[in-house]
């Protein structure tokens, strides 16, 4: 492939990586990962509410990795509330999973910025054949994509398996018990998903630029060596 086309492809991949890094940084700091609807189970059972009557006992919340806000309703009007995961909810949430989500998000940002630098260096500089060259591009794209995948899996498990929304809704609520009615992943979660997809796309762009996948190259070399041994 002509060098000019390679420059265009690498520049495109570098710009996509840079936009991903900015997107993930913004996503980590915003409370737009999950939007949930919560039902005041205690109040609804006391009055035997059904149908439209349940609307008086429906609240909602939205939250991210660090903080969130919502409204509780238990038949006596709306009660707005705000919360922070650290230090407010440390005793109520699976802390190890939550910290790992934040950690992998930070690693994702750092590696995505490294990938941006590598792509631009390959477009305009004279890369080495090892770390700064195609091997480094494939490696950074693969690890970054893996981090993005881990962030989504860990966060989904925290929300669904560990019932994060219910734990938040019932935090410091001694009288009323709340149950999650509906949960939807919102903007920030899908930004991480797009970033994961972009790293997969970058791998295809590297291949489109004319560089073989690392494992394919090693297999071809191994086949050649075996053939040479048989000849001699």
Curated annotation (Swiss-Prot):
Keywords: Cell membrane, Glycoprotein, Hearing, Membrane, Sensory transduction, Transmembrane, Transmembrane helix, Vision. GO terms for cellular component: basal part of cell; lamellipodium; microtubule cytoskeleton; microvillus; plasma membrane; stereocilium; trans-Golgi network transport vesicle. InterPro entries: Clarin. It is a multi-pass membrane protein. It is found in: Cell membrane. The keyword Glycoprotein applies. GO terms for biological process: actin filament organization; auditory receptor cell development; auditory receptor cell stereocilium organization; cell motility; equilibrioception; neuromuscular process controlling balance; photoreceptor cell maintenance; positive regulation of lamellipodium assembly. The chain crosses the membrane at residues 8-28, 101-121, 135-155, 186-206. Glycans are attached at residues 48, 184. PANTHER family: CLARIN (PTHR31548), CLARIN-1 (PTHR31548:SF4). Belongs to the clarin family. May have a role in the excitatory ribbon synapse junctions between hair cells and cochlear ganglion cells and presumably also in analogous synapses within the retina. This is Clarin-1.
